[in-house]
């Protein structure tokens, strides 16, 4: 089912965010040869928003409602871009997402914003492609990008690139990678290796550990010895604070290898996920990357005033997706171009200014984002390098 938004208004500020979406799927990008849906300048543009409503999970339902709220905020903020926003429930699964895509096509959707999960995105993509419709997925899984799919979530590649550049600027060019066994760890390792190569740094060593406490603790001594022997002055961790990050860094500290003293620790995940993480002794002085903190705070404040609840960390993706659509419609109408969502317009190198920072889509369907660097400092996250406000700056 879908809900038709009664809001048709306009952009008092450009909008688009960063965040991360969930799930991994391995698939080839869908071939996209059909022309993109044309926009009638005299009619509202039908935009399909796909959210994981009807999942049966209370947390997911809350996230879905947050995304709907944020999307309606974006429509309300739009100026001279009539959007007919329709909301489709995906249930957070591929089967419902495919059915939602079929309904969206039948309803005349000219672009799809969402869905959240990579498996749902993979199910939606071929249905949308057949109708000549582009998909702005909330996922950060690069394997689903390409063809008619553009992902909005912050990717490992973007995070790794930002952190490597910061380390290189600080003279730390000999880098090690400590990663957990499994798909997620291997994916993060690959992103870091590519960032090291792109930025002229050196890979000192890469070492993995098993995802169970007993074996992780036993492996820590050997990992510490390997790091010391490599002479690495920066160490990347791919793991999350919700999994093994705290334990592996504490185990390294017990084996006399510590951040700042022996090397600069850096992480692909958000180390500000809780106050407990920020006071973890083994993470003090460590770096991680986040969307623009000042813009994020501004959006969160606006969201709470408008909706009476705190914004979910991923809700800005929905705002930014709808606002990007509005910006492209405005630009197309100003130039008399009926092809508002062409690849050339989507991949404009100037990108979009989002509610949590700048981002732009790449030709392969992935994205780049402007991120800030934060340092763990006795229970707080301190910004040591701001996010850029346009592409081409040092922090982009």
PLM regions and their residue ranges:
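Extracytosolic ligand-binding ectodomains
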Residues: 2-396
């Amino acid at each position: 089912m879908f809900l038709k938004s009664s809001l048709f208004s306009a952009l008092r500020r450009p909008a688009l965010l960063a965040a991360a979406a969930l799930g991994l799927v391995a698939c080839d990008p869908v071939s996209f040869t059909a022309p993109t849906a044309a926009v009638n300048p005299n009619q509202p543009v039908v935009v399909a928003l796909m959210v994981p409503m009807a999942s049966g999970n209370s947390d997911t339902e809350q996230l879905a409602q947050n995304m709907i709220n944020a999307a309606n905020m974006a429509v309300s903020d739009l100026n001279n871009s009539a959007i007919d926003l329709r909301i489709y429930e995906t249930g957070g699964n591929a089967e419902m997402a495919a059915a939602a895509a079929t309904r969206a096509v039948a309803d005349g959707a000219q672009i799809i914003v969402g869905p959240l999960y990579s498996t749902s995105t993979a199910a939606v993509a071929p249905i949308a492609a057949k109708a000549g419709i582009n998909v702005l997925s909330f996922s950060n899984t690069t394997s689903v990008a390409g063809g008619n799919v553009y992902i909005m979530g912050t990717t490992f590649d973007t995070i790794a690139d930002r952190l490597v550049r910061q380390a290189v600027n600080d003279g730390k060019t000999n880098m090690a990678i400590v990663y957990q066994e499994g798909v997620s760890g291997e994916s993060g390792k690959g992103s870091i290796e590519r960032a090291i190569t792109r930025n002229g740094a050196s890979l000192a060593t890469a070492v993995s550990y098993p995802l169970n406490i007993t074996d992780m603790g036993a492996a820590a001594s050997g990992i510490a010895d390997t790091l010391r022997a490599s002479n690495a002055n920066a160490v990347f961790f791919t793991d999350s604070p919700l999994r093994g990050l705290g334990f592996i860094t504490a185990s390294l500290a017990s084996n006399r290898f510590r951040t700042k003293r022996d090397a600069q620790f850096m992480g692909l995940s958000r180390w500000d996920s809780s106050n407990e993480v920020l006071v973890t002794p083994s993470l003090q002085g460590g770096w991680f990357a986040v969307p623009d903190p000042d813009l994020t705070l501004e959006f969160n404040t606006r969201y709470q005033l408008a909706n009476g609840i705190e914004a979910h960390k991923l809700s800005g993706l929905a705002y930014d997706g709808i606002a990007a659509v509005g910006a492209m419609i405005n630009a197309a109408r100003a130039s008399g171009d009926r092809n508002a969502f062409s690849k050339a317009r989507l991949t404009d190198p100037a990108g979009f200014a989002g509610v949590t920072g700048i981002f732009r889509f790449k030709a392969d369907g992935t994205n780049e984002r402007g991120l800030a660097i934060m340092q763990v400092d006795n229970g707080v996250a301190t910004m040591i390098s701001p996010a850029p406000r346009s592409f081409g700056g040092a922090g982009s």
